[in-house]
Amino acid sequence: MSNYAIILAAGKGTRMKSDLPKVLHKVSGITMLEHVFRAVSVIEPAKNVTVIGHKAELVREVLDGQSAFTMQTEQLGTGHAVMMAEEELAGLEGQTLVIAGDTPLITGESLKNLIDFHVNHKNVATILTATADNPFGYGRIIRNENGEVTKIVEQKDANKFEQQVKEINTGTYVFDNKRLFEALKNINTNNAQGEYYLTDVISIFRENGEKVGAYTLRDFEESLGVNDRVALATAEDVMRRRINKTHMINGVTFQNPNATYIDVDVEIAPDVVIEANVTLKGKTKVGAESVLTNGTYIVDSTIGANTVITNSMIEHSVVEKGATVGPFAHIRPDSMLKEGVHIGNFVEVKGSTIGENTKAGHLTYIGNAEVGSDVNFGAGTITVNYDGQHKFKTQIANNAFIGSNSTLIAPLEIGDNALTAAGSTITDNVPADSVAIGRSRQVNKEGYAIKKPHHPSQQK
């Protein structure tokens, strides 16, 4: 029989105190909704339905083309939310997973185990449960003397005995699809919240003598639902530990995994060394045997093998193998540093291609430039690429030597093996094999300094 899935993503998330829908807050680089969707994908649902409501279009954009959607215009409880999916799933043979979109720590493995347990035990409903040291706020799993699940009691409706139970409802279930929608027609709002509880269908199944089971998570952390910023930070912490552990198992060295922040889609090859306080975001890739030192921050970039990035920021760029960057360099979007490039102290590169083995050691700005191989930039070089309205390109050919404090006024071309003298302002193209000097000639005024206040003769 087929698997189906319903993801509940309609809530406002009032306790988040945010204009953003709760399920769109991010954990380790992707939204909570995406984490849940990826976990659900492991069970290979024949159809996935996402229930949306608050700021529905924002939520729809995240899974557009990957899920069917249904609207819950009024938030009248979890049971009501699942009712909204009936049009998409009614009459289908199989089992349906129901899961909240604010549970980013759930794993696909656990959901697969839940489905298998449900099918193997021929249950009409199976509850995913966990054991909590402090169960306050959770619905409790109530069992009879034979260990069978009889009902789920919400915190506000639980008596003193029921409040002592530590087995809690995670809010994730598997149901026989047809029986789910049949039972939903018989639930009501006669409870402390005045809502349609999805959990009431469990009591209906039990009253009909149908089999209800529970599968317990091995790891309570997977059950975490995020309702506020405190829980969001907890989820981030758990996810960070998982991600870093996986990379370490796969051969990456961490100086301090508790102070290293890596998004879930980052790829790192073996034998990379990562020092403390490094952040890798988005879809960054890091090649083998590279070293990322303390304070490095990389976003959506590809870093080649055997590179060394020292306390620098790289955004939406490519750094090829054997390059060195930093310390305190900034590689801005749409840049490419080719093999063996050295970008040093306080150098900024933006929207530029830097050829093989080119060096810009310190205090340089390279913007909107195409630079050949084996070029040397002296300290203080500036490509002047913006006139207040438009950006212009600088082209520097192979083996050029750019003297310290050169100002290159784009648009500009500097030929192969050309040299610009230190301190020059270059406004015209420089032919290959030429020296360009664009500065005033020095004039010495002998004896003039005697009249200046700093001169010893002027001191009293």
Swiss-Prot record:
Positions bound to UDP-N-acetyl-alpha-D-glucosamine: 8-11, 22, 72, 77-78, 139, 154, 169, 227, 332, 350, 365, 376
Binding site for acetyl-CoA: A379, N385, Y386, S404, A422, R439
Positions bound to Mg(2+): D102, N227
Cofactor binding: number and manner: Binds 1 Mg(2+) ion per subunit.
Sequence segments annotated as region (Pyrophosphorylase): 1-229
Location of this chain's protein in the cell: Cytoplasm
Signal peptide bounds: none
Highest taxon, organism lineage: Bacteria
Active site: H362
Associated pathway: Nucleotide-sugar biosynthesis; UDP-N-acetyl-alpha-D-glucosamine biosynthesis; N-acetyl-alpha-D-glucosamine 1-phosphate from alpha-D-glucosamine 6-phosphate (route II): step 2/2; Nucleotide-sugar biosynthesis; UDP-N-acetyl-alpha-D-glucosamine biosynthesis; UDP-N-acetyl-alpha-D-glucosamine from N-acetyl-alpha-D-glucosamine 1-phosphate: step 1/1; Bacterial outer membrane biogenesis; LPS lipid A biosynthesis
Swiss-Prot/TrEMBL catalytic activity: alpha-D-glucosamine 1-phosphate + acetyl-CoA = N-acetyl-alpha-D-glucosamine 1-phosphate + CoA + H(+); N-acetyl-alpha-D-glucosamine 1-phosphate + UTP + H(+) = UDP-N-acetyl-alpha-D-glucosamine + diphosphate
Co-factor requirement: Mg(2+)
Coiled-coil annotated residue ranges, if any: none
Annotated EC: 2.7.7.23, 2.3.1.157
Gene3D superfamilies linked: Hexapeptide repeat proteins, Spore Coat Polysaccharide Biosynthesis Protein SpsA, Chain A
Principal location class: cytoplasm
GO cellular component: cytoplasm; membrane
Keyword match Transferase: yes
InterPro entries for the chain: Bifunctional_GlmU, GlmU-like, GlmU/GlgC-like_hexapep, GlmU_C_LbH, Hexapep, NTP_transferase_dom, Nucleotide-diphossugar_trans, Trimer_LpxA-like_sf
Keyword set, alphabetical order: Acyltransferase, Cell shape, Cell wall biogenesis/degradation, Cytoplasm, Magnesium, Metal-binding, Multifunctional enzyme, Nucleotidyltransferase, Peptidoglycan synthesis, Repeat, Transferase
Family recorded in the similarity comment: In the N-terminal section; belongs to the N-acetylglucosamine-1-phosphate uridyltransferase family.
Function of the protein: Catalyzes the last two sequential reactions in the de novo biosynthetic pathway for UDP-N-acetylglucosamine (UDP-GlcNAc). The C-terminal domain catalyzes the transfer of acetyl group from acetyl coenzyme A to glucosamine-1-phosphate (GlcN-1-P) to produce N-acetylglucosamine-1-phosphate (GlcNAc-1-P), which is converted into UDP-GlcNAc by the transfer of uridine 5-monophosphate (from uridine 5-triphosphate), a reaction catalyzed by the N-terminal domain.
Assembly and binders: Homotrimer.
HAMAP family: GlmU (MF_01631)
Protein known as: Bifunctional protein GlmU
Organism: Streptococcus thermophilus (strain ATCC BAA-491 / LMD-9)
